[in-house]
């Protein structure tokens, strides 16, 4: 769903990228049919895309808020296209004055890295957009090394303006440029990719923690006999535990302090979320959360 155009040469580096993401939900077979027609250029408008998606019973979500290109420093720009599924596949282009790198990443592994020097143009995107952009560049790109950076920016903007009719490209786009050479180019790339891997690790931990929290929430007792009063405290039956808070790693208790009008030997029940003494309407309260073990 992307279009990224990157120029690098003796006069600097320029990168432009659209912001569109399209998500497909439905049968894999029909998704492939829709994607093939979309990326081949057969579908020529959002209206046509929505109509065919409805016909194929595919739900599509279009978002135009992903910044695919960025300026890492005053000497390096970067762009990324990605495919997220069971595996996360990324292709990144980094550029500085007179140099660029193309990096392929699979999940948390760099699978390929190519460094190019001198001047050139890198176009990333689906095959239809890539072909159209390259056709436009043939007319002007040979003059880029002799142009001021601003003029190159304008030329790349013009290509985005010409292609934004296509449903895989957003109407808005981002352009960044630098005119300095980064002597530690490969080190900058390494650190930037390491930050991606750290982010992915943090995200994994957050998802694990979220899963733990949801598991706890789903185990909160709504109904049932949970324990008995002994020595003025609630002693929970084997199937239950008490926790101090909804958290991935809460403190766990089998005996807890409770408040209410009760006596030793009373059985405590939970009915529709309310804790009380069995056979009475005497409510019992505690600062703890009772969950299934």
UniProtKB/Swiss-Prot annotation:
Pfam families attached to this UniProt entry: MJ0548_C, MJ0548_N
Superkingdom: Archaea
Transmembrane segments: none
Protein name in the entry: Uncharacterized protein MJ0548
Coiled coil: none
């Amino acid at each position: 769903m992307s279009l990224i155009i990157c120029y690098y040469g003796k006069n600097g580096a320029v990168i432009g990228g659209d912001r569109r993401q399209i998500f497909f939900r439905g049968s894999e077979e029909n998704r492939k049919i829709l994607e093939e027609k979309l990326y081949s250029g057969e579908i020529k408008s959002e209206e046509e895309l929505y109509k065919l998606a409805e016909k194929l019973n595919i739900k599509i979500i279009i978002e135009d808020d992903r910044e695919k290109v960025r300026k890492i420093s005053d000497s390096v720009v970067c762009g990324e296209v990605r495919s997220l599924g069971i595996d996360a596949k990324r292709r990144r282009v980094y550029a500085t004055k007179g140099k660029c790198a193309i990096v392929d990443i699979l999940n948390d592994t760099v699978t390929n890295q190519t460094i190019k020097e001198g001047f050139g143009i890198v176009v990333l995107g689906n095959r239809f957009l890539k072909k159209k952009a390259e056709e436009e560049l043939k007319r002007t790109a040979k003059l880029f090394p002799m142009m001021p950076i601003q003029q190159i920016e304008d030329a790349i903007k013009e290509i985005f303006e010409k292609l934004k009719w296509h449903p895989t490209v957003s109407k808005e786009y981002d352009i960044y440029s630098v005119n300095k050479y980064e002597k530690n180019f490969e080190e900058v790339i390494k650190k930037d990719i390491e930050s991606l891997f750290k982010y992915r690790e943090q995200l994994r931990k957050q998802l694990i923690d979220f899963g733990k929290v949801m598991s706890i929430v789903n185990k909160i007792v709504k109904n049932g006999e949970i324990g008995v009063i002994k020595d003025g405290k609630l002693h929970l039956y084997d199937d239950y535990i008490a926790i101090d808070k909804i958290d991935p790693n809460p403190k766990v208790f089998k005996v807890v302090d409770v408040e209410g009008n009760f006596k030793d030997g009373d059985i405590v029940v939970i009915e529709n979320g309310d804790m009380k003494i069995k056979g009475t309407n005497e409510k019992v309260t505690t600062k703890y959360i009772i969950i299934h073990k």
